[in-house]
C-alpha cells in the first residue's frame, strides 16, 4: 500500500525527558479523570503511544495494578531506555517498553485503552498509525487523544484534523472535552466504527 503524503508535524522533543514530570501536571491534565473516561481500571491492558518520559505510563501502571499491563510505546530509543530505567527504579513489573515504528506501535497484544498524550501533532502518517493501532484494540476499547490547538508545526494540531483523520482510519468520535482553562488543550475519545 503506498504511503500517504506526510503532513506537517512538529519536531519531536529531544531534550531532558524529566521536564514532563512538572509539578501540577496531574491536576492540570486531570489525568485521573482521563483514566476514568478511558475505562482504565485494575486488570486492563493500556497503550501509551508516544510515551516519552513515561509520565502517563507510570500513572496507568499503578491504576491497572499487577493484573494489568501497560505498553509504553515510543519511536525514540532514548525514551525507551529512560522508561526502562524509570520502571526499574519505581519497581513496576507490569510495564512493557516497546520501540515502535513511526506508523505502527507494534503492540504485541490487544489493548483496552490507548492514550496519545501531546503526541498526535508529531505523527507524520497518522491515518496509517491509527489503522495499525485499530488492529490491536480489544472489543469496546477507547482511544484518547490529548493535544493542543495548532497547525501541526507548533506542537499542536486542530481537533477537526484529528477527528477527520481518525474517521478515515475507521474510528468514530465518542466524546470530546476541554479540560484545561486555556482553551487550547482538548481531549478526544474514539472507538472503532
Question: Each predicted region: which residue ranges?
Answer:
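Conserved beta-strand signature within the Rossmann-like core of class I S-adenosyl-L-methionine
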Residues: 140-152
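A short acidic, Gly/Pro-enriched loop at the edge of an enzyme's catalytic core
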Residues: 44, 105-114
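Class I SAM-dependent methyltransferase SAM/SAH-binding core
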Residues: 47-105
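A short glycine-rich, Lys/Arg-flanked "PGG" loop and its adjoining helix->strand segment in the class I
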Residues: 61-62, 127-142
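Class I SAM-dependent transferase core
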Residues: 1-47, 55, 82-85, 116
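Core SAM-dependent methyltransferase catalytic element
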Residues: 163, 173-193
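A short SAM/SAH-binding and catalytic strip from SAM-dependent methyltransferases
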Residues: 112-126
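Short glycine-dipeptide loop
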Residues: 42-43, 66-68, 137-143
Amino acid at each position: 500500500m503506498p504511503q500517504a503524503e506526510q503532513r506537517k508535524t512538529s519536531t519531536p522533543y529531544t531534550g531532558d525527558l524529566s521536564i514532563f514530570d512538572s509539578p501540577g501536571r496531574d491536576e492540570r491534565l486531570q489525568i485521573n479523570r482521563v483514566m476514568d473516561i478511558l475505562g482504565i481500571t485494575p486488570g486492563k491492558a493500556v497503550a501509551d503511544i508516544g510515551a516519552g518520559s513515561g509520565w502517563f505510563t507510570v500513572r496507568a501502571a499503578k491504576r491497572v495494578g499487577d493484573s494489568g499491563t501497560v505498553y509504553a510505546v515510543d519511536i525514540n530509543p532514548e525514551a525507551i531506555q529512560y522508561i526502562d530505567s524509570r520502571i526499574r527504579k519505581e519497581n513496576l513489573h507490569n510495564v512493557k517498553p516497546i520501540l515502535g515504528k513511526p506508523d505502527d506501535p507494534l503492540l504485541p497484544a490487544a489493548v483496552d485503552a490507548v492514550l496519545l498524550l501531546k503526541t498526535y501533532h508529531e505523527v507524520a502518517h497518522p491515518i496509517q498509525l491509527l489503522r495499525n493501532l485499530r488492529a490491536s484494540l480489544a472489543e469496546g476499547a477507547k482511544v484518547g487523544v490529548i493535544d493542543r490547538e495548532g497547525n501541526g508545526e507548533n506542537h499542536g494540531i486542530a481537533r477537526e484534523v484529528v477527528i477527520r483523520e481518525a474517521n478515515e482510519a475507521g474510528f468514530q468520535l465518542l466524546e470530546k472535552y476541554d479540560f484545561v482553562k486555556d482553551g487550547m488543550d482538548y481531549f478526544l475519545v474514539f472507538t472503532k466504527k
